[in-house]
Amino acid sequence: MTITKQCVGIDISQDSFAACICFSESSQTLHFGETKHFKNDKSGFNQLVRWVRKQCEASVETVYLMEATGVYYERLAHHLHKLKQTVHVVLPNTSKHYFSSLNIKTKTDALDAKVLSQFGVERRHKVWQPPSPILLELRNLTRFYVQLQETKTALGNIMHSKESAHEVQSVILKSNRSLIKSIDKQIEVCKANIKKLISEEPGLNAKVKKVLTIKGVGLITVATIIAETLGFEHFHSIKQVVSYAGYDVVERQSGTSIKGKTRISKKGNRYIRNILYFPAMVSCRFNPELKTTYLRIIQNKPSKMVGQVAIQRKLLALIYTLWKNDSEYIEEYKKEVAPTIKAEATLDSSK
């Protein structure tokens, strides 16, 4: 038996991860080792590396493949990179298509790790590199900004209910107002820190300014999307970005008996969907091209939300296109922002 490729597939969660090794022989035959579970901490990472070294062929490169599931994969990916191991990180929707191609319907940690190891052997993937520290800092700030806004909204709802209730003590109302005022100050500080961080990085600042030429899109919106996608590093098509954000369309239909409403999956990055809500509303009113699109979509539709979501998707596609092409938005010149960008071509793994 001559091993030509070997890949460690890793299915990772908050507290633990499952690992399985797939071996490819010169005859193209695949075989799998046992699946082993480890804790998602430094001790578990070191145990994984020692286990892999015992299981794998020393003369053949060992690669590791995992999904970009939230932030849970990041510590392990960084740990392996520091040890000079080859790491591949794939988008969840990319691996989902591969799972579907194998007609796999069961879902367990062990099975996912096994299939991911096979995915790493059978397809070519881009080698993962640690994202820019600036983008990681930006993501921390933009997520904190969203959390502050959500806290303010929750406090506002409490305030409304207390003001409408019968004989609520004034100390409670005063305390709630004080909390909202404090949150407002923190929001302004967070916004200032986001602006400062971007302005201190000339390359990032220049690209952000070009994206800001889209009417209706503000700095916090662009900063959040760039931070959540880490500068679109692992994205090679608009379809991938749309799916990652949870804007991909789901349709439930079977013959003539079942025909449900078409909707977006929402199985994606909530921070992106959250931050695009208000810019889409503004664009529907003040961006001529997007307003035309919005009015066309909602024509004869009972709900305007269909049009709102379509504009959110459109804005996300525009931001992706301008960022990848390093260009500005030119109003009423559709060819400049058409989704046929030069970065569309990709490796097999991005399909």
Per-range role (PLM):
Residues 2-24, 116:
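Gly/Thr-rich phosphate-binding beta-strand-loop-beta motif of the actin/hexokinase/Hsp70
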